[in-house]
């Protein structure tokens, strides 16, 4: 929006960071530009968060240099594209993403700086109610993945809903995101599949709000990896 008081400009996605400019009008209605704001985070949603934080600080009268330095030093919270380990040039990440918008944003950011690497999404569906109400959006948010590995649904206290079918859900993702999808039964099954099929220089991202974080971390030490 060219009429907006604050505008994000020239977003550049790097391997481990994102850089952008922020254009705004000061109290005297003069155009100001903050260039090369660097955040050690990926994804458009993190650019929006960093811009929002900058705007608050600007309106509170904070020094621009301090704003930029603070954002550059901020490494984010745990489970937001947290690198867990690397093995055979394969990089394993863990992310809390469990909503279609989050998933799409993460994968879009990763793909922009890794155009040739294979991206494997290990997705743990979270809550029957969420998956069933957003099935269509979930089915379309994995288009930047070369492979989606679907784990058992984590109910988070909800009673089992027999109307939900994991195979049908997986087939919809394959169809609408136009990508390969497989289902694993448990943690051991995931480890065995990756051990057999991983080659090199691939990116594996665990996504979900249940126990997927433990599964990804466990791959480093498991007997079947």
Regions found by a protein language model. Name each.
Residues 11-33:
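Acidic-glycine-rich active-site phosphate/pyrophosphate-binding loop
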Residues 20, 37, 92-95, 181, ...:
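Generic structural signal for residues in well-ordered beta-strands
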Residues 1-14, 38-44, 68-72, 184-185:
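Beta-strand->loop->alpha-helix junctions that form or flank phosphate-binding loops
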Residues 189-220:
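A glycine-rich beta-strand to alpha-helix segment
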Residues 139-200:
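C-terminal helical cap/extension that packs against the catalytic core
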Residues 28-147:
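Nucleotide phosphate-binding/pyrophosphate-handling subdomain across enzymes
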Residues 98, 125-128, 153-156, 209-212:
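Short glycine-rich anion-binding loops that position phosphate/pyrophosphate groups of nucleotides
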Residues 105, 133-135, 161-162, 195, ...:
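Short amphipathic alpha-helical segments
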């Amino acid at each position: 929006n060219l009429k907006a008081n604050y505008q994000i400009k020239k977003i550049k996605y790097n391997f481990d960071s994102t850089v952008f400019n922020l254009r705004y009008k000061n109290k005297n209605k003069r155009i100001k530009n903050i260039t090369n704001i660097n955040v050690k985070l990926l994804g458009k949603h993190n650019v929006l968060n960093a811009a929002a934080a900058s705007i608050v600080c600007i309106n509170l009268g904070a020094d621009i240099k301090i704003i930029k330095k603070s954002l550059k030093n901020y490494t984010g919270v745990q489970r937001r594209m947290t690198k867990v380990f690397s093995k055979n040039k394969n990089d394993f990440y863990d992310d809390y993403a469990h909503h279609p918008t989050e998933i799409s944003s993460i994968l879009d950011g990763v793909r922009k700086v890794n155009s040739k690497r294979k991206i494997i999404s290990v997705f743990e569906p979270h809550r029957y109610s969420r998956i069933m109400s957003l099935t269509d959006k979930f089915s379309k948010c994995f288009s930047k993945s070369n492979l989606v590995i679907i784990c058992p649904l984590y109910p988070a206290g909800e009673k089992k809903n027999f109307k939900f079918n994991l195979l049908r859900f997986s087939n919809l993702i394959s169809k609408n995101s136009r990508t390969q999808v497989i289902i694993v039964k448990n943690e051991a099954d995931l480890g065995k599949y990756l051990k057999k099929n991983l080659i090199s220089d691939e990116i594996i991202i665990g996504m979900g709000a249940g126990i997927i974080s433990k599964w990804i971390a466990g791959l480093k030490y498991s007997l079947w990896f």
